[in-house]
Swiss-Prot record:
GO biological process: actin filament depolymerization
Pfam entry (one): Cofilin_ADF
Provenance organism: Arabidopsis thaliana (Mouse-ear cress)
Outcome recorded upon mutating residue 135 to A: Reduces binding affinity to F-actin and actin-depolimerizing activity
Keyword Phosphoprotein: yes
Post-translational modification, as annotated: Phosphorylation at Ser-6 by CPK3/CDPK6 inhibits actin-depolimerizing activity.
Taxonomy of the source species: Eukaryota, Viridiplantae, Streptophyta, Embryophyta, Tracheophyta
Gene, per the UniProt record: ADF1
Known partners and oligomeric status: Interacts with the 14-3-3-like protein GRF6/AFT1.
Function of the protein: Actin-depolymerizing protein. Stimulates F-actin depolymerization. Involved in plant development, cell organ expansion and flowering by controlling breakdown of thick actin cables. Severs actin filaments or bundles and promotes actin cytoskeleton disassembly. Binds monomeric actin (G-actin) with a marked preference for the ADP-loaded form and inhibits the rate of nucleotide exchange on G-actin.
Entry's Gene Ontology cellular component terms: actin cytoskeleton; cytoplasm
Record-stated family: Belongs to the actin-binding proteins ADF family.
Name assigned to this protein: Actin-depolymerizing factor 1
Subcellular location: Cytoplasm, Cytoskeleton
Amino acid sequence: MANAASGMAVHDDCKLRFLELKAKRTHRFIVYKIEEKQKQVVVEKVGQPIQTYEEFAACLPADECRYAIYDFDFVTAENCQKSKIFFIAWCPDIAKVRSKMIYASSKDRFKRELDGIQVELQATDPTEMDLDVFRSRAN
């Protein structure tokens, strides 16, 4: 079904990969992109569980918008191992205005398709989504 605001549909693979990350932890991260010609959100890249945050961040283009899911592992003050599922709306300042508008207008509908997101981040440059930001938002 297409999003009324932007006309973007969500490919079934987007939800499938998210469920694999959430339930089976078979992925560390998922990067999604909007295919304007097909008018839908698709999976661009899936990260293996052993991949690092740095490898994830390197997958986000410096000049194009993306959505991403990151499974963030951390240790609480009580020394408990936990994880939180982050949704990142990556919209660099230097991205094309049209792209920013399409990603912004499609975001809420896309997020509703992914049941289980625990934290949302919006980032326009890498400092807005570095590991310290993840740590502070996870607790």
